């Protein structure tokens, strides 16, 4: 059986992973109906409320997401997974265990993230914000980096990503 591709979109909250990921999902679905869209916030709801936002819990959550992506990929399903994914160990695991793994790092400045803060995370002061209260491990070897400080629309970002993927 052919394995699916896992498009792992990673960045901090508010950088655009869900928006760009949803556009990518729709684009793939036009030609390949066997694709699913997974978002970190939704996955937390699906898996239940047993994990919080400590560094240890975030790592457990990220590994759940990674294993689910591998399971789906092993069954020939393409997966667009949008998650903060702040650990090198998780991204390394993905590269070692998911044959069709594509890592997309969407990078935005903290100033941009604070402006876009729809969830109120960057002003909450609750001590659990990745990239503010917890240092993240920025991806060292993403397949592509999409700078997203507002110079391009999500559709333009998608076009850059699609052009990159077509070259692969």
Specify the residue positions occupied by each region the protein language model found.
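P-loop (Walker A) phosphate-binding loop of NTP-binding proteins
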Residues: 12
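Small-molecule kinase domains that catalyze NTP-dependent phosphoryl transfer to phosphate-bearing small molecules
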Residues: 107, 115-160, 164-168
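Conserved phosphate-donor/acceptor-positioning beta-strand/loop module used by diverse small-molecule
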Residues: 81-82, 97-116, 146
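ATP-binding Walker
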Residues: 15
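Loop/turn-to-beta-strand initiation segments
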Residues: 34, 74-82, 102
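Conserved substrate/cofactor phosphate-moiety recognition/catalytic segment
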Residues: 21-67
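Hydrophobic anchor at the beta1->P-loop junction of P-loop NTPases
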Residues: 9
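Walker A/P-loop
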Residues: 18
